[in-house]
């Protein structure tokens, strides 16, 4: 039987995705049930425990193919946006979630219990989350979008219809994350890692990207010479386990664990520091256009 990447294929010794029958061995196979993320943000963990490693996150409105739910409140499934497999909190998912109509375009969109920003926010939606909006209301000159199911309201200007044109410049989207906190496994504007910065920014420009750096390096763009004199805006610079986005021929934007945030720094300085700390040389530069 073939060895498949467990990050992108749902299989264990005891259970596997029915679509993998004949490809991997398992005691049983399941077709899975599609559920929608109803939490603002849902953790995806390596194991069914709240203290297990955070491998990624799912945002409201995304769909998950669930293969198993445990009595302890965990759902083992696959995020359909990028194929990532892991354990989700069961209460963050619903088979009856409303079909999204809009996507969030603000870095953070607070959710209020009603159409009034003076009410205490009950949560917050990150950039790229998808929501179902059923109407509008105006309070003191500010227009609010009303969420389906009476779940509250957001400022209407912070969301656009799903069919709205994508962003033209993914680098400009990435720059909006400047100073956002670094979070290993994070995939939202509340905290994210280097590959999530690339994935989210490209998603706003209608470009699908894998979740992890090694997968991105294989899938995105074409290789160009890893030479500081030849890089330009939008190029992706990869290391083993890291990626950054070039703003121009000199400066790079990246979610840096060293700096604990999204930062801009000269590419040359990043290359020297990463090598000095044992991260090796840049492995490739990829150009999307």
Residue locations for each model-derived region?
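Low-complexity, Gly/Ser/Thr/Pro-rich intrinsically disordered linker/tail segments
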Residues: 272-289
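Boundary regions of SH3-family modules and the immediately adjacent low-complexity/disordered segments
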Residues: 1-33, 49, 62-65, 72, ...
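Short, well-ordered loop/turn sites that connect or cap secondary structure elements
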Residues: 52, 58, 125, 230-231, ...
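Loop/turn positions that initiate beta-strands
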Residues: 61, 122-133, 233-234
């Amino acid at each position: 039987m073939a060895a498949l990447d467990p990050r992108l294929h749902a299989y264990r010794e005891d259970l596997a995705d029915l679509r993998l029958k004949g490809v991997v061995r398992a005691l049983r196979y399941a077709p899975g049930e599609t559920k929608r993320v109803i939490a603002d943000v849902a953790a995806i963990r390596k194991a069914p425990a709240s203290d297990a490693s955070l491998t990624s996150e799912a945002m409201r409105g995304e769909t998950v193919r669930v293969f198993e739910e445990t009595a302890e409140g965990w759902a083992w499934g696959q995020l359909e946006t990028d194929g990532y497999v892991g354990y989700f909190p069961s209460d963050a998912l619903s088979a009856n979630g409303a079909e999204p109509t809009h996507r969030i375009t603000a870095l953070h969109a607070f959710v209020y219990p009603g159409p009034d920003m003076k009410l205490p926010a009950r949560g917050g939606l990150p950039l790229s989350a998808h929501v179902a909006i059923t109407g509008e209301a105006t309070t003191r000159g500010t227009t609010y979008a009303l969420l389906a199911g009476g779940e509250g309201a957001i400022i209407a200007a912070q969301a656009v219809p799903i069919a709205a044109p994508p962003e033209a410049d993914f680098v400009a989207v990435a720059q909006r994350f400047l100073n956002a906190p670094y979070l290993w496994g994070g995939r939202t504007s509340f905290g994210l890692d280097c590959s999530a910065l690339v994935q989210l920014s490209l998603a706003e420009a209608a470009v699908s990207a894998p979740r992890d750096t090694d997968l991105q390096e294989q899938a995105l763009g074409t290789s160009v010479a890893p030479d500081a004199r030849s890089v330009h805006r939008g190029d992706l610079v990869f290391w083993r386990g890291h990626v950054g986005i070039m703003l121009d021929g000199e400066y790079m934007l990246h979610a840096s664990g060293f700096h604990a945030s999204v930062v801009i720094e000269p590419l040359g300085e990043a290359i020297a520091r990463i090598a000095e700390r044992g991260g090796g040389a840049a492995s490739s530069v990829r150009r999307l256009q």
